[in-house]
């Protein structure tokens, strides 16, 4: 018989039977002629999922497809995606740990409220990261062979007072967000070795300035 097992973390997750999830089988698109992977992490990874209806699940087989911005999972050897809308998910990248993604943010550029963003910091003034993939084509001089590769791009967005804006993370853009905290930022940069291209460093800066 089906049973529930509690999993205690920052929020309460439950390991529910797969039959509880409304899922839709999908046929995986094979990019056999493209070098690289369309996924955030090529292997199946453990993670947690929160649906918009509030239900939470823990999985051993999640992958995030960056080409179509969809979260997929394996059930009985078949690839599925969630028929019910996903609000947030957490996935282990096997390197830095768990990465948390959410949607429902304001539409910006060519992105809409269904687009997933990695949460770098979600304090009052937040920072989010969009990871995207596209296919680029190239060929060597004198060759008719076209080489296709997946190209990964990273974009950062700030959320302040309901306004979602693309930024380049650096001292100038951060000061523009935290207008009255130039002294605090200067003190922080003097005492800490900061790499503005490092997500962990950016998270710490935003946490510090949001105090």
Can you say where each PLM-predicted feature lies in the sequence?
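A short, solvent-exposed beta-edge/loop patch
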Residues: 141-204, 211
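Bacterial Sec-dependent N-terminal signal peptides
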Residues: 1-14, 205
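Aromatic-patch recognition
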Residues: 40, 47-166
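Solvent-exposed, flexible loop/coil residues
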Residues: 35, 43, 66, 198
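Sec-dependent signal peptide cleavage junction
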Residues: 10-38
């Amino acid at each position: 018989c089906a049973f529930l097992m509690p999993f205690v973390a920052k929020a309460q997750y439950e390991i529910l039977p797969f039959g509880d999830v409304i899922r839709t089988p999908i046929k995986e698109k094979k990019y056999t002629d493209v070098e690289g992977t369309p996924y955030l992490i090529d292997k199946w990874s453990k993670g947690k999922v929160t649906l918009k209806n509030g239900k939470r699940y823990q999985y051993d087989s999640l992958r995030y497809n960056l080409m179509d911005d969809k979260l997929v999972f394996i059930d009985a050897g078949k690839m599925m995606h969630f028929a019910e809308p996903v609000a947030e998910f957490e996935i282990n990248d096997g390197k830095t740990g768990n990465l948390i993604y959410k949607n429902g943010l304001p539409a910006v550029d060519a992105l809409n409220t269904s687009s997933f963003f990695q949460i770098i910091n979600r304090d009052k003034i937040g920072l989010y990261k969009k990871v995207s993939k596209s296919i680029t084509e190239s060929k060597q001089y004198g060759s008719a062979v076209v080489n296709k590769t997946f190209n990964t791009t990273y974009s950062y967005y700030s959320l302040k007072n309901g306004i979602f804006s693309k930024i380049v993370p650096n001292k100038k853009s951060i000061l523009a967000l935290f207008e009255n905290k130039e002294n605090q930022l200067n003190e922080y940069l003097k005492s800490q070795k900061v790499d503005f291209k490092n997500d962990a460093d950016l998270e710490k800066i935003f946490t510090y300035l949001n105090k």
